[in-house]
UniProtKB/Swiss-Prot annotation:
Keyword Ribosomal protein listed: yes
Protein's name according to its UniProt entry: Small ribosomal subunit protein uS7
Keywords per UniProt: Ribonucleoprotein, Ribosomal protein, RNA-binding, rRNA-binding, tRNA-binding
GO BP terms, alphabetized: translation
Bilayer-spanning residue ranges: none
Pfam families: Ribosomal_S7
An annotated GO cellular component: small ribosomal subunit
Family listed: Belongs to the universal ribosomal protein uS7 family.
Role, per record: One of the primary rRNA binding proteins, it binds directly to 16S rRNA where it nucleates assembly of the head domain of the 30S subunit. Is located at the subunit interface close to the decoding center, probably blocks exit of the E-site tRNA.
Record lineage: Bacteria, Pseudomonadati, Pseudomonadota, Alphaproteobacteria, Acetobacterales
Length: 158
């Protein structure tokens, strides 16, 4: 057993434009090599594109949260060794990890898209996620399908 203490969670400040902590988390995940202003520009630009596309009443922050909620997984499978055999055991995902996975999947799906700028790719992936389609939503569906297929091993949960 490890004798180390658990690392203290750092407080994340809300983003300057919308005052939202989740958007800051998203920017931090998107950021490469500490280039926060570049990540900020991409996220704010993508949200602006979403606002323009959604009409005058569209709230980009609400759309962002809706997209994130549509990508969050409820269950996932974790490997568990029992008597020489490895079972994929479905377990419920903690709220914190749920958010982290959704953010990671949205960014990965955006990076794999074919549009020219990251801003376009991100806004299109977010719009797809709002409408329950796109690669990130497919990833969540696949995860849920795996958990459903391995439901028989759920008694191995720890």
């Amino acid at each position: 057993m490890s004798r180390r203490h658990r690392a203290v969670k750092r407080e994340i400040l809300p983003d300057p434009k919308f005052g939202d902590v989740v958007i800051t988390r998203f920017m931090n995940a998107l950021m490469y090599d500490g280039k926060k202003s570049t990540a900020e520009g991409i996220v704010y630009g993508a949200l602006e594109v979403m606002r323009r596309r959604g009409g005058t009443t569209a709230d980009p922050v609400a759309m962002f949260h809706s997209a994130l909620d549509n990508v969050k997984p409820a269950v996932e499978v974790r490997s568990r060794r029992v008597g020489g055999a490895t079972y994929q055991v479905p377990v419920e995902v903690r709220a914190e990890r749920r958010q982290a996975l959704a953010i990671r999947w949205l960014i990965d799906a955006s990076r794999k898209r074919g549009e020219n700028t990251m801003q376009e790719r991100l806004s299109n992936e977010l719009m797809d996620a709002v409408n329950n389609r796109g690669s990130a939503v497919k990833k969540r569906e696949d995860t849920h399908r795996m958990a459903e297929a391995n439901k028989a091993f759920s008694h191995y949960r720890w």
